[in-house]
Amino acid sequence: MKTKEFKLKKDKVPYNKKPEKISFKEWQIALRKQFALDQKFKIKNSGEHPVYSDFDVTNPTTQKTYKVAIRSNTIGYNFCSCPDFKVNNLGTCKHIEYVFAQLRSKKSNEKIFNTDYKPSYTSVTLKYGTERKIVLRIGSENNAAFKELATDFFDKQFFLKEDAINNFGVFIEKAHQLDPAFRCYPDALEFVIAEREKKRRHSIIEKNTLKAMMMFN
């Protein structure tokens, strides 16, 4: 989803009142972008790619360090281990926005941001936002084979089908057979496990309700 951009250096976004011309979500994202510009976090790239990589972001004041994973230029596909990111349903946070601001400030990264990035490996990730979804991102290695495998588990937009949750382990096993470099990120796996448990509990409730109804008939 594309969000409206503020020229933050010229137009300060008010913290105590939402501007009328934007939605609540756009306001909250803009606030985090604005706050990020004033920070002096320390960044360490713990991966291999200059942009699409894992970063350790440390606040020198609190000495707290969070992991930021930059996987896409599109909001919702990145990750941060901070508490705010886990609950805000925005798909971003001040740490992600700070990393993006620092990366975009380097002229050497300009071409990377203007080019579609496709890694060699295929991965399963969790798309964050108002609605969280499991998404398959197919890399360049064994591209055709992964697309064929995906048809039984993912829709045309490569979001996990609802009826494929219980068979997710089968997909993971076959994906690793296609390419040992295949990745399923921990937050995506945790989400699938949680969704399975919700379905299991719902099924138990339905069965118990049906039994109770039959007893009184």
Go through each PLM region and give its residues.
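Long, low-complexity, compositionally biased intrinsically disordered regions
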Residues: 1-217
